[in-house]
C-alpha cells in the first residue's frame, strides 16, 4: 500500500517493545515458508496473503517474544491455576518467609526458571485439552476466555544482579512488582484458548523473535534502553545475536527507560541515532 499508493520506494519496519518480535515474525513470513494453520490448528493460509517484504528493520526497546517474556515473568509459585493465591513459599519471591533471598544463588535461579517454564507448559496442556473437548462436541469455532494470575515475578525485579543494567532496582514498568503481579493489567492477564497458543505458549507460538530473526537478513538496528524496566539488556543482546543480517548495529541509549517517561531529554538522541543509521544506508 505504501509503495503502490504513496510511491515509497523503500519500507523500514519499526518494532517497539512487543512490536519488535512481531516485525521479525512478519518479515520471516514475507520471505520464507508461510504458515497454513494457526497455532491452534485452525486453517489460515498465509501463502495466499500479500505480504511485501521490508527493506530494513528497527528493533526499538524490543523484547524477544511475547511467549518467552511472559514465561520469564510468570510466578512459578502458582501450581494450581484454579487456586492462584495458594503459592509455594520457596518459589514466591514476594513472600518474606521464602528462605531464598537476593542476590539469588545460581541453583535457585535454575530451579526458578525451570518452574516458570513448567507452569507455561502446564497451561498450554490445559488449553489444548479444552480445545479438544470443544471440537469433540462439535463446537469447532467456540472459544473459552480465561485469566492468568501472577505474571510479574521475574527474578530481575527482585534482584538487580540478574541481567544488570541502569534500571531502578526493585520495581518494574508497571510499578511495584508484587502489586503488578496480580493487578488487572499484565501480560496475558485476560486471554483465550487460541490467543494463548498463538501468543503466549512457550512451545507453540510461531512469533518467536529469536527463531524468526535467524532468517531475517535485512539491515537491522537494535536499540537498547539501559534503564528499561521491561526489556532488560539481554533482550537486545539476544535479538542482535540471533539476527541473520550481515549489516546489523546495536546501540545503547544510556539512562533511557522503556517509554522515555522518566528521561524525555534522551528521546531526541535516540531519534538521532535512528535517523543517522537510516541516512547512512540511503533510507532517508
Located regions from the model:
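Alpha/beta-hydrolase
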Residues: 92-211
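C-terminal alpha-helix
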Residues: 2, 273-284
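Catalytic histidine-centered segment of alpha/beta-hydrolase-like enzymes
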Residues: 256-269
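Gly/Ser-rich "nucleophile elbow"/oxyanion-hole loop immediately N-terminal to the catalytic nucleophile
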Residues: 2-17, 97-107
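Short beta-strand/loop motif that positions the catalytic acidic residue
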Residues: 216, 222-224, 228
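Short glycine-rich catalytic loops that host catalytic nucleophiles or stabilize transition states
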Residues: 250-256
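Primarily recognizes the serine-hydrolase "nucleophile elbow" in alpha/beta-hydrolase
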Residues: 4, 10-82
Amino acid at each position: 500500500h505504501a509503495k503502490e499508493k504513496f510511491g515509497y520506494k523503500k519500507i523500514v519496519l519499526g518494532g517497539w517493545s512487543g512490536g519488535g518480535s512481531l516485525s521479525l515474525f512478519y518479515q520471516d513470513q514475507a520471505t520464507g515458508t508461510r504458515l497454513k494453520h494457526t497455532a491452534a490448528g485452525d486453517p489460515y493460509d498465509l501463502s495466499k496473503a500479500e505480504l511485501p517484504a521490508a527493506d530494513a528493520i528497527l528493533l526499538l526497546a524490543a523484547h524477544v517474544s511475547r511467549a518467552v517474556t511472559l514465561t520469564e515473568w510468570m510466578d512459578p509459585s502458582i501450581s494450581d491455576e484454579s487456586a492462584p493465591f495458594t503459592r509455594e513459599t520457596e518459589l514466591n519471591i514476594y513472600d518474606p518467609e521464602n528462605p531464598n533471598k537476593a542476590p539469588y544463588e545460581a541453583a535457585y535461579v535454575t530451579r526458578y526458571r525451570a518452574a516458570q517454564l513448567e507452569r507455561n507448559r502446564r497451561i498450554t496442556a490445559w488449553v489444548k485439552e479444552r480445545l479438544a473437548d470443544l471440537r469433540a462436541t462439535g463446537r469447532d469455532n467456540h472459544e473459552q476466555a480465561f485469566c492468568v494470575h501472577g505474571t510479574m515475578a521475574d527474578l530481575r525485579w527482585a534482584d538487580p544482579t540478574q541481567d544488570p543494567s541502569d534500571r531502578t532496582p526493585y520495581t518494574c514498568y508497571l510499578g511495584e512488582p508484587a502489586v503488578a503481579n496480580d493487578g488487572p493489567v499484565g501480560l496475558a492477564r485476560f486471554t483465550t484458548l487460541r490467543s494463548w497458543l498463538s501468543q503466549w505458549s512457550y512451545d507453540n507460538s510461531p512469533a518467536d523473535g529469536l527463531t524468526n530473526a535467524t532468517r531475517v537478513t535485512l539491515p537491522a538496528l537494535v536499540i537498547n534502553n539501559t534503564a528499561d524496566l521491561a526489556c532488560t539488556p539481554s533482550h537486545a543482546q539476544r535479538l542482535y545475536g540471533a539476527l541473520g543480517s550481515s549489516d546489523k548495529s546495536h546501540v545503547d541509549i544510556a539512562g533511557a527507560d522503556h517509554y522515555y517517561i522518566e528521561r524525555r531529554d534522551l528521546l531526541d538522541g535516540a531519534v538521532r541515532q535512528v535517523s543517522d543509521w537510516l541516512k547512512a544506508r540511503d533510507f532517508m
